[in-house]
Structure formats: structure tokens, C-alpha cells
Design a protein with these regions (language model features):
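Active-site groove signature of glycoside hydrolases
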Residues: 86-106, 126-136
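Hydrophobic alpha-helical membrane-association signature
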Residues: 78, 112-115
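Distinct, well-ordered alpha-helical segments
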Residues: 10-14, 37-41, 106-113, 138-156
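Short N-terminal helix-initiation segments at or just after the protein's N-terminus
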Residues: 1-4, 103-111, 161
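Acidic/histidine-rich catalytic cores of soluble enzymes
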Residues: 24-25, 55-58, 117-167
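Active-site-proximal loop/turn and secondary-structure-junction residues that shape catalytic pockets
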Residues: 4, 29-33, 61-64, 98-102, ...
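N-terminal pre-domain/capping segments
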Residues: 1-91, 124, 156-160
Length: 167
């Protein structure tokens, strides 16, 4: 995962990972977005293919589950641009983080389930699966059980859970 090499650029990672024997990587989307400000998508895809490096997952998108109003619109617009990147680069899975800074009430939980379902529906249109990542430091969705419950309740076949061994 490029999360482990944040100080390096996307191009540096794209060269170093295969040199270290890695044939696949989880791309840090902010790195890819920054890289694409200077290098075309076509040239980037060619460089990845030449290096023998496949982008198998993308990290990560937040702000989708609980945001409302203009914030929700901004997060979903950003999400759709990232889905387009996933489609362009053949990245099959996008990691979504549960943005539960505070303990949610029943209305917020309902909104989170609906938002996850809507996000999964958008992702399906781009041929992308979503992987909901839970974190022990979150106020909610801090373990496998709550992540599985949210995914199950959203009812979308392309929504699943990310088991992140990094933290």
C-alpha cells in the first residue's frame, strides 16, 4: 500500500515497488491525483504496464456516510471523480472509510446505511467494488461486527468490508 510510502511520489513508488518484487499495489488516490496533474493517464498506465505493476485497490474515500447538504454534494462529486480514476486504471476496489467521529444516533445510522448503498450503486456503474474500512479509534464502525452490519444492511452486492492488517 502506498500508505506505507507516503513521503515518496507516485512515480517513485511505481518504480520502487516492482524493483522490490511487488507486482500489485493499493494506490493512495491523493498521490495518483497529484501525479496526473503533470503526467497523462495514458502515460501513467503505460509506465505501470511496463513496470509490471497492477493497481488492485484504491485508498481511500471518506465523507460519504454521514455528510449532509453541500458537504455531501462535495464528497460525492469527489467520489465520482475517483470512481472515474478507478475505471480508467482498472482498479477493482475502492476503500471507503467510516467517518464516525462521534457516536451516531438512530437517524445518523440510517443515513449511513442509505449513503453506503447509494455509494455502492454509483461504484457499480463504474465496475468498482467498495470496501468499508473499520478502525478501532472511530466512535462507531470500530470493529468487524459493526462494519459487517452496515454492509449487510446496505444490501448492495458490490459493498464489502476491508480487513486492514496495517492498523
Amino acid at each position: 500500500s502506498q500508505a506505507t510510502t507516503l513521503p515518496a511520489s507516485f512515480a517513485e513508488d511505481a518504480a520502487a515497488y516492482p524493483a522490490a518484487g511487488c507486482k500489485a499495489a493499493e494506490v493512495w488516490l491523493t498521490k495518483l491525483e497529484k501525479h496526473l496533474q503533470e503526467v497523462t493517464a495514458e502515460d501513467t498506465r503505460k509506465a505501470l504496464a511496463d513496470a509490471g505493476l497492477a493497481l488492485v485497490a484504491a485508498a481511500y474515500q471518506g465523507g460519504l456516510l454521514l455528510s449532509q447538504g453541500e458537504q455531501r454534494k462535495a464528497h460525492f462529486d469527489h467520489f465520482k471523480r475517483r470512481l472515474d480514476l478507478c475505471q480508467q486504471f482498472g482498479i477493482p476496489t475502492l476503500v471507503v472509510v467510516a467517518d464516525f467521529a462521534q457516536s451516531p444516533d438512530a437517524a445518523a445510522l440510517g443515513r449511513a446505511v442509505v449513503s453506503l448503498a447509494q455509494a455502492a450503486q454509483w461504484a457499480a456503474g463504474f465496475g468498482v467494488r467498495l470496501a468499508l474500512e473499520f478502525r478501532g479509534t472511530d466512535a462507531f464502525c470500530s470493529n468487524l461486527d459493526t462494519a459487517l452490519t452496515l454492509v449487510e444492511q446496505c444490501g448492495e452486492p458490490n459493498a464489502g468490508v476491508c480487513l486492514d492488517a496495517f492498523h
